[in-house]
Every structure is written in C-alpha cells, then in structure tokens.
Amino acid sequence: MVKHMFLEDVNNLISDDKWLIFQNEYNTEVNPRYETLFTLTNGYMGVRGTFEEGSEGERSGNFIAGIFDKSDAQVREIVNAQNWLRIKLYVEGEELSLDKCQLIEFKRILDMKKGILFRSMLIKDSKDRITRIEGYRFISRSDLHRSAIKLFVTPVNYSGVVGIESIIDGTVLNSADSPKHRVKHLKVADNSSLNKSGVYLETATIDDDIRIATGSAVRLYHYEDKEKNNIAKFKRFLPLGEMSIEYFEFDGTENKTVVIDKFIITYTSRDVKKGLLKSTVEKELFAFAGEGIDKELQRHIEVYEELWSVADINIEGDEEADKALRFNIFHLMSSVNENDPMVSIAAKALHGEGYKGHVFWDTEIFMLPFFIYVHPKAAKTLLMYRYNMLDAARKNAALNGYKGAQYPWESADTGEEETPKWGFDYMGNPVRIWTGDLEHHITADIAFAVWEYFRATEDIEFMLNYGAEVIFETARFWVSRCEYVKELDRYEINNVIGPDEFHEHVDNNAYTDYLAKWNIKKGLELINMLKEKYPEHYHAISNKKCLTNEEMEKWKEVEEKIYIPYDKDKKLIEQFEGYFDKKDYVIDKFDENNMPIWPEGVDITKLGDTQLIKQADVVMLMLLLGEEFDEETKRINYEYYEKRTMHKSSLGPSMYAIMGLKVGDHKNAYQSFMRSANVDLVDNQGNTKEGLHAASAGGTWQVVVFGFGGMEIDKEGALNINSWLPEKWDKLSYKVFWKGNLIEVIVTKQEVTVKKLKGKGNIKVKVKGKELTIE
C-alpha cells in the first residue's frame, strides 16, 4: 500500500492497489508515456497527464471532442486547446522546478476506480528548503464542464513567503515538439479578470472561429481551517499576451499545510452561443467555487461507481492481467460522451495528437462491441455520429465516381475525408499515403457495426429511423464499386488496401470483397424484413432513397457474383490476388515484449513485395463472419497468417488471441492477449506518447469476453457461451447487456454460471452447446 505518503484526507480517497497505476520515479525519458497513461477524460474533454508546474520535454494536451481546425496543417486535426493545468510555486522567489530542484520523494497514482490522478513529492531547492507537495485532480464525469485541482503545500524545514502562479496558457501548439509540423490553431479572443475573483481566456480557431472558453479561480486556506478563510496577502491579475495569470503570495509556516483549490470551467461555441460564453463560464465558475471541490468530486465518483458496476471484469489468479484489463476498460469507458451524437472516439481517443484526433474503423470494429454490451446508450450515440455524417459520405462517394455512401478512411467533425496525403515510412522517408484513396472496407465495417448493435439490443427504433438507411446506402456504394469482368462472369473489387496496410493497390482483397458481399446481402435481407414487418417504414425509406425493384435485382446479381480468392480444397484464403506469389518470410524471433522482430533479409522499404503483413486481415474476416467458415478453415488460415504477421499495428494481437482460442492455440492466444493488454502499459509499439491505443483497449475487452469468456452470437441470433480459461486463471466474471437484460457470466475451470441481474422475461443461452433458460 502507498497511503503512508499522503495526508489523511487524500489517503481516504485512494482505492485498493488493484485499481491503481503507479509512477514511482521522475524521468524525462518516460514521462511522455505516463502523460498518456495518466490522461483524464470525460468524453467531452481530455487532458494529458502532464505536471501542473510543467516539466522538460512534456507533451501537454487539452483536447475537446469535436473541435478541429486545419490552419497550416495538411488536414483538419484536433485542436490542442489552452492549458489550464498550470500552477507554479515559488519559495522566496525561487521556482520549485521539477528539473532544477532535487526530488527527495516522488510518486503519482492513477486511481481507475474513481478517475482521479494523485501526486506526492518532497522537493529541495537550491537553499536546502524542503517542501512537500501532494494532491489530486479530476475532470468531472458528472458535470462535463467542471475540472478541479487540489494541492496541499507544506514547508517542511522553513518559514517564508510562498508564491503561486495559476495560469491558463493559450500559447499552445499542435506538434509543438516538431519544427517541421508544428501548427498554431488558436488566437486569443478575450483575456480578462472575472470580477477580480478568477481569470478568463477565450480562444478562437483560425479557420472556423470556433470559440473555446476557460475560466479558473483559486482559493487558498490553511488545512486545519474548516472555514477555509483566504490567506493570500498579495494578489495580482496578469493578462500576459496569450496567458491569463493570477499570482498570489502567502506566509508559509514550517510544518503548516496550505491548501490550493483550483476550479476550472470549460465551454465552447458548440455548447452555447458565442455571445453567452463568458457569462456562462463566469456563472458556472463561481457556483462551483462556492460549492467547493468535495461535492463535485463525490458526484464524479458516483458516476464511475455506476459505470464500473457493469464494466468491471474480475480475473482471479492473474493479477497482471486483471489490472491491465481494468486499465484498458477505464480509458475506453472514460473516452465516450454518450450525449453528443456529433462526435466519436478517435484512434488515440482524447489522449494525444496521434492520428490527428481522427476517427477510423477502429471505433466500429474494435471499440464498439464493448459499448454495445456494456453501455448500449453510448454505442447508439457512436453509431449516430456515423448517421449524422451520412450526407458527407454520400458526397464522398459522388466525388469518387460512386453511388450511395462511401465513408472516409479518416473522419473528423465534417465527415469528409481527412487522411493526409503524405507521411513517413519506417526509415523516415516521405511516402504517399494511399489509405484515404483505397482503404474502402471501412464502409462495410460501419454497416457491420450497425447490424451488430441491432442484433444485441433489438433497438428497432434505431434501425428503422437510422440504421437501415446506413446499410442501404453503403450497399448501394458497393454495388457501384464492383467491376464486372465479362469473360469470367464475376464482379471484382480492384485497387484497394485491406486491413493489412503493407500491401497497397491490390485486387480482390478477401476481407474487402467478403464484407462488401455481406453488406449487400444484409441490405437485401433488411429490405425483406421491412416489407414484411414494417411496411410503412419500408415505403417511407424506399421513397426517400428511391429503392426500385430494378436496383434490387442488380444488388442480387452483384452479391451472388462477387469474387473471393478462396481455394476450397486447400481451405486457404489468399489475402488478395497474387499474395502467394510474393517473397515469403516466416517470423521466428521476438523481442523482450514478445513482439515480432523483422526476419533477416527483409527490406522494410519494400514490404509490399513480401508475404509479411502488418496486422490481421484474413483472420479478421474469419472473426467477423465466423459462421461463414468451418473450424478447419479457421485453423489452416490462422496457422498460415499468424507466422507472417508483424503486429506493427496494435489492432492485431487481440484478434489473433480470439482466433487462437477458437482453433486451440491456447498458449499463443494468451501471449497475444497480454501483448494487447499491455500495449500502452509497457509501450510495446513504442508510440504510447502519441496517445492511447484505443482500438487495442477495445480488442483487449473482446479477447476476455468473446475469447476466454466464450461469448458469441450464432447464426440464429442466440447467445452462446463456450469459455476457456488460461492455466493461472481461477475464475473469470463479467457482465453484459443482452436484448435489454443485464446478465452476469461466471466462469471457472469446472462450470459456467449465467445469472440475470436486471430485465424482464426469460433469456435463452447456450452454454457449451446446452440450451438453458435464465429466469
């Protein structure tokens, strides 16, 4: 336990060790990784885990969902907004700098149960004065606009004047550490004092004049003073250009603790009209400061308690896996705003600037299953983002010469294609990025996600009013995307990139072709369902979308004749036409994190000439459409492609773990699971500093529930449980929503127990092939 390091008030807040992630030393080399690990977010805003006082080499970040700007960047990117964390301390004028003073003690703790970041340190300055600083901060999950910092400052061996600078810093940049790419997305619109009781900084984005308004107020008082009387003997407001600063001084007394409460309110012009921003922030700020931090903190903790009551998974017998899984779940469920259907979850969530804050297929295929089964309201909101971007997808299809709706590979706030045209290869050479032009499978991925949500929730209102249109318009795209080859009497999808991005400009990628076929077929099935059960809705949508019998016949023809490169005798699916003709390498060496090492002789600038792949492709297909393939086909393809997958994307290990369990490769499945679970905790991709691997977090949950927990939906739409536990696991328990009912599944080596916790009516579940009725 670590509680001896903290004051009693802080001790009482900290959860048990299984909920805690620790940083035990200050190190500028690894700090950027901890900044990502210790990011706090409520889905509306994410603030990286930098230090209040700042530090050398930090990557500060304050990201607000839905706030994008292009300015001088290649494409629209999430804006790094003004930094409100800053609190600098001075003793008799000398700054207590993490990089210039001596750190005698140091610890930071992320409390995942409560969504709080704790800190404690003992610091000695150049005059040998020792100061203890401890405290915590949180971004409220109850009121999304509220954040707070509480610090306890104790002069250990001196008395003297202590100064405090509370800063809202608008000098922030995107890509600040890269002279080649850094961009300024904000200009200051207002920097002012709030009735001498707080400060206000309002910024505006360069392109669209979106306003971001931040207000902060500081309260100083002695720790023992229950009345919290102000002890500042000097106070000054400094509107220094793009920084809004309050400076305070108080008389520090040896071994007497002073409390610094910093209250922060954030609003944007997405929330309220520009003319009302300042008055809204001021009103909310003083209401918050008047109430105090404790009440908001309690409400915040209660929201997390409610979320964890469904989301928490217990693994008994494997503490490392148990905590790593909890870490992934914490960040995933913290990253969604279930009340805003105009935003989604980016590939790096709100944890960093990686991938420019863009939304990929990661959300629908890797993250969404968690929300479907744990937080269905949030899942619906994420799908509504795609529905709300449907017009942009139609525009995208038309621009590319197709019909229907073609979703962009990278999406931001407008729904238009935001993939950069240029990037860098593994050697740092500039390369053309083709994913935005060619990685079309995302369109089918989104349709697939719509159907998966419907299967699990039976939310017919969503399907009738929103989901059906997405499936129809994406099916229409695929019919126009397919090319008819007369001499072979088949339809092909040529010049694409599949999930494996080592190979570009390929023809008939099996994943893409199969998902396109599925998308068109599902569109036809849905039309028949609507005709039969909801004729009024069918007539409305068919009139709106001009669905004709002639077009439906075309859909049937294309769906039946789409070509899949599949040798049914060998049962081996060729990833794309010509893949087996590439130079073959087999992976046989791994690094200290059990990640593959490039085979000897590989030219990593010409990976497209080899059979090495970046991530799961054919294996991914067999997971999504598992009912289409028999067990032997799955095993043969898993064994072939597993040896050739470099896992240069964090998306791969979780998928190989699930498939490994399905085909009996239990040892490698567990290793793949731990690769996925630890991707950020041990930084096995080497880029955690750029932000959370959010898709891997979702994939990690899938491995435990769909893999070890054995949960799947069969062809008939029934819930199946076919579990398998690793040797060191004694018990696994998880909860999911299934068609409006909350159920708990408890798995041991001896038995599987399924309980209904909430809901009406009986539930039928197949446990290891035996049908049970759960009352």
Curated annotation (Swiss-Prot):
Q: What is its EC number?
A: 2.4.1.230
Please give the activity regulation comment for this entry.
Answer: Inhibited by Hg(2+) and Pb(2+).
* Active-site residues from the entry: 501
Task: List, in alphabetical order, the Gene Ontology terms for molecular function in this entry.
Answer: carbohydrate binding; hydrolase activity, hydrolyzing O-glycosyl compounds; kojibiose phosphorylase activity
Effect caused by changing residue 284 to Q: No change in kojibiose phosphorylase activity
Which UniProt keywords are present, listed alphabetically? Carbohydrate metabolism, Glycosyltransferase, Transferase
Listed binding positions for substrate are 361-362, 614-615
Residue ranges of the TM segments:
none
Q: What is the effect of changing residue 137 to Q?
A: Retains 60% of kojibiose phosphorylase activity
User: What general EC class does the enzyme of this chain belong to?
Assistant: transferase
Tell me what happens on changing residue 459 to N.
Strong decrease in kojibiose phosphorylase activity. Increases KM for kojibiose, beta-G1P and glucose but minimally affects the value for phosphate
Q: What is the effect of changing residue 614 to N?
A: Loss of kojibiose phosphorylase activity
Domain of life, per UniProt, equals Bacteria
Can you tell me which family this protein belongs to?
Belongs to the glycosyl hydrolase 65 family.
Name of this protein: Kojibiose phosphorylase
Which species does this protein come from? Answer: Thermoanaerobacter brockii (Thermoanaerobium brockii)
